[in-house]
C-alpha cells in the first residue's frame, strides 16, 4: 500500500475498523469514568477549601489547597508515568478482562488513576466556582431552620452548585477526552494507541522514521475525525445549555422589569 488509494483500503478492512472502534469505546469509558470519580473527589476538595476555615479544620483546607495547586500546575504526562511506575494495582485487575491481558488491565488501571487525580484538581476549582455562586444568606437561612451543615450542603448548596456548573463540567469532559490521548505513551489501549498499533502492525510505524506518509495521513486523519465528532457534539450540547440558561435569565429579567413598570403605573 504505497499510494493513498492503498492506504484508504485499510478503512474498508472490518478488522481494522473494529479494532479502532474498540479504542474509541475505551477512550470514552476511561474519560467518563475519570470525570465521574473526579467530580466526587473534586467536590470534597472544594468543600474542604471553602468551608474548613476553623482552627480544628484548617489543616483540611491546607491539604486541599496543596492538592489542587500541585495537580493543576504540573503536566498530566508526568503523573501518568508516576502512577504507572509507583501506583499498585489491585488484585481484581490482575487477570484477563474486556478482551485485554492482565498487563494491559494493570496499565489501564494505573493510567486511569493518574487521569482521575489530575482531573479532580481541575474539577475542584470548577465546583468551588459553583459554591461561590450560592448566596451565603441561603446557608444562614438553613441554619436558622435547624439544618445541620451537612444537610445544608446536600439539600441547598450542592444542588444549586451543580446546576450552575453543568456546562463547565461538560467542557471538562471534552478536555478529558483529549487528555486521554496521553495514555498512548504508556501503551494503554485507547484510540491513539490503537491507531499507532495499526500502523505498527502494517510495518508502517516502527520508530525508525520508516513511515508511509499516506498511511499516517489516513489513520491519524480518521482518529482526528473521531475526536472532532465526539467533542463537537458535546460542545454543541454545552452551547445549547448555555443559551437555555441565558434565555431563562433574560425571561426572569424581563418579567421583573414588567412587574416594576406595572407597579409604578399602578402607583401613579
Regions found by a protein language model. Give the residues of each.
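Transmembrane alpha-helices and adjacent helix-loop boundaries
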Residues: 1-268
Amino acid at each position: 500500500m504505497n499510494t493513498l488509494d492503498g492506504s484508504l483500503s485499510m478503512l474498508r478492512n472490518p478488522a481494522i475498523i473494529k479494532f479502532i472502534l474498540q479504542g474509541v469505546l475505551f477512550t470514552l469509558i476511561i474519560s467518563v469514568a475519570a470525570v465521574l470519580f473526579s467530580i466526587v473527589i473534586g467536590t470534597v476538595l472544594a468543600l474542604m477549601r471553602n468551608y474548613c476555615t476553623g482552627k480544628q479544620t484548617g489543616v483540611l483546607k491546607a491539604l486541599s489547597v496543596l492538592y489542587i495547586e500541585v495537580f493543576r500546575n504540573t503536566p498530566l504526562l508526568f503523573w501518568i508515568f508516576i502512577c504507572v511506575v509507583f501506583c499498585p494495582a489491585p488484585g481484581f485487575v490482575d487477570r484477563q478482562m474486556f478482551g485485554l491481558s492482565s498487563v494491559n488491565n494493570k496499565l489501564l488501571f494505573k493510567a486511569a488513576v493518574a487521569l482521575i487525580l489530575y482531573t479532580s484538581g481541575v474539577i475542584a476549582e470548577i465546583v468551588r466556582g459553583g459554591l461561590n455562586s450560592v448566596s451565603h444568606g441561603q446557608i444562614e437561612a438553613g441554619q436558622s431552620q435547624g439544618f445541620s451543615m451537612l444537610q445544608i450542603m446536600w439539600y441547598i448548596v450542592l444542588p444549586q452548585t451543580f446546576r450552575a456548573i453543568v456546562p463547565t463540567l461538560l467542557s471538562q469532559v471534552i478536555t478529558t477526552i483529549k487528555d486521554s490521548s496521553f495514555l498512548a505513551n504508556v501503551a494503554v489501549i485507547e484510540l491513539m494507541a490503537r491507531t499507532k498499533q495499526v500502523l505498527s502492525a502494517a510495518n508502517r510505524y516502527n520508530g525508525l522514521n520508516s513511515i508511509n506518509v499516506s498511511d499516517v495521513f489516513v489513520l491519524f486523519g480518521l482518529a482526528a475525525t473521531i475526536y472532532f465528532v465526539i467533542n463537537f457534539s458535546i460542545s454543541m450540547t454545552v452551547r445549547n445549555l448555555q443559551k437555555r440558561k441565558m434565555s431563562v435569565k433574560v425571561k426572569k429579567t424581563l418579567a421583573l422589569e414588567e412587574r416594576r413598570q406595572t407597579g409604578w403605573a399602578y402607583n401613579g
